C-alpha cells in the first residue's frame, strides 16, 4: 500500500504515467477500470439485467452512479455489442465534468472535490473519453443514448432518506 498526498485524479495520473513505462508494465497491472479487462465481467451485469427484464417489453434504461465512468462504459460496450439498451443515465456528485460537457459541449476536466460519495470524486474520468470514442466523438449521437446529472451532498442525503422512508431500503 502507498499513501498519496492528493485526490483520486492525482493517483490515476501517477498510474497512467507508470503504465507508459514498458519495463514497469511487464510486472505491473491494474485492477481498476483503466484496464479494459475489468469491463468484460462488468458487461455481464447489463446482459443479466436484460435477461431478467426483457419479458416486460419495456425500453431498457440504466441509471449508474458514476465516478471514473468504468461501469457505465461497460454498459455502452454491451450496447455496442447489440444489447438493446435505449438510454444510460450517469449520476455524479459535484464533480460534474460530464454533466457540464453534455450541456455546453466543452469537455473541461477539473480538480476533484471531496464529497460524501467519495467513490465518485473524480474530476477527469478517464473512461468517459472511451465513451466518447464509442460514439465516434459525436456529441449529438452520445446525447441520444446518454444523459448525466450532478447532485450535491445535501441532495444525496435527501434522496437517501426519501428512499429509506418509502421503501426501508438503506442506500
Regions found by a protein language model. Give the residues of each.
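PLP-dependent amino-acid enzyme catalytic core
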Residues: 1-171
Amino acid at each position: 500500500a502507498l499513501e498519496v498526498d492528493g485526490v483520486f485524479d492525482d493517483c490515476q495520473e501517477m498510474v497512467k504515467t507508470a503504465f507508459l513505462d514498458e519495463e514497469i508494465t511487464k510486472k505491473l497491472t491494474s485492477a481498476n477500470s483503466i484496464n479494459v479487462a475489468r469491463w468484460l465481467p462488468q458487461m455481464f451485469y447489463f446482459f443479466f439485467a436484460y435477461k431478467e427484464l426483457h419479458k416486460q417489453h419495456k425500453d431498457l434504461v440504466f441509471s449508474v452512479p458514476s465516478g471514473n465512468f468504468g461501469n457505465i462504459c461497460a454498459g455502452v460496450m454491451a450496447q455496442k455489442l447489440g444489447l438493446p439498451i435505449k438510454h444510460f443515465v450517469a449520476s455524479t456528485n459535484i464533480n460534474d465534468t460530464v454533466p457540464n460537457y453534455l450541456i455546453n459541449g466543452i469537455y473541461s476536466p477539473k480538480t476533484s472535490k471531496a464529497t460524501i460519495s467519495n467513490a465518485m470524486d473524480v474530476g477527469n474520468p478517464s473512461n468517459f473519453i472511451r465513451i466518447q470514442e464509442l460514439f465516434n466523438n459525436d456529441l449529438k449521437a452520445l446525447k441520444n443514448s446518454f444523459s448525466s446529472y450532478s447532485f450535491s451532498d445535501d441532495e444525496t442525503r435527501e434522496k437517501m432518506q426519501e428512499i429509506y422512508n418509502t421503501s426501508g431500503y438503506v442506500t
